[in-house]
Swiss-Prot record:
Induction: Expressed in the late phase of the viral replicative cycle. It is found in: Virion. One of its GO terms (cellular component) is virus tail, baseplate. Homodimer; each gp6 molecule in the ring interacts with its two neighbors, forming an N-terminal dimer with one and a C-terminal dimer with the other. Heterotrimer with gp7; gp6 is part of a (gp6)2-gp7 heterotrimeric molecule. The (gp6)2-gp7 heterotrimeric molecule further interacts with gp25 and gp53; the gp25-(gp6)2-gp7 module is involved in sheath contraction. It comes from Enterobacteria phage T4 (Bacteriophage T4). It comes from the Viruses. This is Baseplate wedge protein gp6. InterPro entries: Gp6-like_N, Gp6_C-I, gp6_C-II, Gp6_C-III, Gp6_II_1st, GP6_T4. Belongs to the T4likevirus baseplate wedge protein gp6 family.
């Protein structure tokens, strides 16, 4: 009984195999091995260091270390959550039905003004017509752009043509091969844009089915698939259906799902765009760089829609990074190739349009059943183009449920107007003040990109200032005052739900920017002797709250007689608001709505004072308010953004040099 193991478990003896695999280095493993050998009778008092057996111990230790490292790496690289190599994460994601994004071409739409020497009724601008454009803030090394499709333009009465072309950055590459079912089809070009691929089999175009469900493909469907190889190249492959003829009916059949396989020795042509990716974002200054017979390009309009937020070519992107693949690859499997939940919509949009979408959130509205509202912010600018919206909507049609209609909308943007004061040591600044200001703006932009420009995220003034302090070693300290800004598209009347900041604001702090009012009166211009309309600036402001937390929304100042008064329309006589200083004695303010401070809701309707929208020469106004806290929160599809290129008025920087 004395030798019976406790609880009938084996106990370690002197000659038992040691736990030498616990060691993580060569020295530890070798030491554990020697200690184990010293415990055996054959090697008692044996000098391992001075013997030839030391070489064998080295060999065993190295072998154990290699096995340990390879085994550890193999286990880690087998799972998406623990893999370190991008190739391992990519292969695991593709097993879940997620194709990682390749480089994507920057795109834009332009309108040409052309003439034709033959004066034909219409002309055709073929796919692949070349143009050149320069990236933002550069005038060297222009980027190639090509038209994505054939465009037909009809001659107008002035014998001119105005084709609108969709351009993609890069060059069209055409590869032709003879199909061999034993040889993989691989494109060895890491600059390929997988969304701009066309594949032809014996002259007939086949359809890319990579992101679609195999359930919807028949055995004779002419489709193909793509996947990323271990070394980052792109492989094309087909289904396993082999064509045959039904002897009784004479119909073409196949005996396998997933699509048809080309016949042996078929001619396969692959056309794709090889692009520079994100480097070409913001490209402007387009010029015609091709030669079309009898066609002359007179002018190129880079912004045919007159978009005030035009940013040039955008949508260019680099290959998807490993962490994004790791996250979306797992979620994509849960979607089961259909859009049902809000997360499903977010995942599909992020997967396919990740190169142009920075943030996306899907939500529903109980008052509008049957719609899935998808708020998306592009990486460049603030608003998606009409073409981009339609592309997203059309892409989702294959995955959303029939009773649900996806609606692509812009987020409810909240801007933070920042008045920044930065103190720096004059003797430590090695560059100019202009350079330092640029560094500060870059740091603020980085803070917004990393922490703020995410739905349901928050802005903290203190955290932004830590980024500013890290802009350069010469910065001693910084301080800032902030205001929240809503851009109101319809200044005349607020939506039925009102305007919200989703944060508490201070009394009488809500003020709009000034905008022009046409009084309808005429005055003679002494310089020209001609009559002109009398115009002056007014603005919308709020008053202090009353005992119930309700304040008034008023507009002014108007000149006497410019607003027709009656028993329901009378000037506001209180002094609990910030008046707009003016030099012509205007002092008439009128109530047009109210502000509920505790509930954070603002309403107004200028029609209450019998003025029409034509009286105001403005479309969009900026509505400023002071928050009660330095931490700003968002919810319900609202998004805090920083776009200094498009909205420079929301940032002022005061640099104060100090000699030390």
């Amino acid at each position: 009984m004395a030798n019976t193991p406790v609880n009938y478990q084996l106990t370690r003896t002197a000659n038992a195999i040691p736990e030498i695999f616990v060691g993580g280095t060569f020295a530890e493993i070798k030491q554990n091995l020697i200690e184990w050998l010293n415990g055996q009778n054959e090697f008692l008092d044996y000098d391992f260091e001075g013997s030839r057996l030391n070489v064998l111990c080295d060999l065993l230790a190295y072998n154990t270390l290699y096995i340990q490292q390879f085994g550890n790496a193999a286990v880690y690289e087998s799972f998406m959550r623990t893999a370190n190599l991008r190739s391992s994460v990519v292969q695991a994601a593709q097993d879940n039905g997620y194709l990682p994004t390749s480089k994507s071409a920057a795109q834009t739409e332009i309108m040409l003004t052309c003439t034709d020497a033959l004066n034909r009724n219409y002309i055709t601008i073929p796919r692949g017509t070349r143009f050149l454009a320069y990236a933002k803030d550069t005038s060297v090394n222009p980027y190639n752009f090509v038209s994505r499709e054939d465009v037909i333009a009809i001659r107008d009465k002035n014998n001119q043509y105005f084709p609108r072309l969709k351009l993609a950055q890069g060059r069209i590459v055409r590869t032709e091969i003879i199909y061999d079912k034993l040889t993989p089809i691989i494109i060895y070009d890491k600059n390929i844009d997988r969304n701009q691929v066309k594949l032809y089999v014996d002259g007939a175009e086949w359809i890319n089915w990579t992101r679609k469900s195999m359930v919807h493909a028949g055995s004779t469907s002419t489709i193909y698939y793509m996947r990323e190889t271990i070394d980052g190249n792109t492989e094309f492959y087909f289904g396993e259906g082999e064509i045959s003829v039904n002897a009784s009916e004479g119909a073409l059949t196949a005996n396998y799902i997933g699509g048809l396989k080309p016949t042996q020795n078929s001619t396969i042509v692959i056309e794709y765009i090889s692009t520079n990716g994100a480097d070409a974002n913001g490209a402007v200054g387009f010029s015609y760089a091709d030669t079309l017979t009898n066609i002359t390009v007179i002018n190129i309009n880079e912004n045919p829609n007159d978009d005030p937020d035009f940013v040039g070519a955008d949508g260019g992107g680099d290959p998807e990074d490993i962490e994004r693949i790791r996250e979306l690859g797992t979620i994509k499997r849960e979607t089961q190739q259909r859009c049902v939940t809000a997360t499903d919509y977010d995942t599909f949009v992020s997967e396919r349009f990740g190169s142009i979408i920075q943030a996306v959130q899907t939500f529903t509205d109980s008052t509008k059943p049957g719609y899935a509202f998808i708020a998306a912010k592009p990486k460049s600018g603030l608003y998606l183009t009409t073409v981009q919206r339609e592309d997203i909507k059309n892409y989702l049609k294959d995955y959303n449920l029939a009773p649900i209609t996806p609606s692509i909308i812009s987020p409810n943007y909240l801007f933070i107007k920042t008045n920044l004061k930065v103190t720096y040591a004059l003797n430590k600044l090695q560059e100019s003040e202009q350079w330092l200001e640029g560094q500060i703006i870059d740091k603020i932009d980085r803070y917004y990109t990393e922490d703020v420009e995410i739905f349901n995220s928050s802005f903290a003034k203190s955290k932004m200032l830590t980024y500013v302090d890290d802009a350069d070693h010469s910065v001693i300290g910084s301080s800032a005052t902030i205001q929240m800004v809503r851009e109101v598209q319809n200044f005349y009347k607020t939506p039925e739900a009102g305007i919200k900041y989703n944060n508490q604001i201070k009394d009488r702090s809500m003020e709009s920017n000034t905008f022009s009012f046409n009084s309808g009166r005429k005055v003679v211009n002494p310089d020209t002797g001609l009559e002109e309309d009398v115009l002056y600036d007014v603005r919308i402001v709020s008053t202090d709250r009353d005992s119930k937390g309700i304040g008034k929304v008023i507009i002014g100042p108007f000149a006497s007689g410019d607003v027709t008064e009656n028993e329901n329309i009378q000037p506001y006589t209180g002094n609990d608001f910030n008046k707009l200083a003016n030099s012509d004695g205007r002092d008439k303010y009128y109530v047009i709505g109210e502000i509920n401070y505790p509930a954070d809701v603002i309403y107004w309707n200028i029609a209450k004072i019998n003025l029409t929208s034509e009286k105001f020469e403005v479309q969009t106004i900026e509505l400023y308010s002071d928050p009660t806290d330095d931490v700003i929160f968002t919810r319900d599809g609202s998004l805090i953004v920083f776009e200094n290129d498009l909205r420079p008025q929301y940032l002022t920087i005061d640099l104060e040099p100090i000699s030390q």
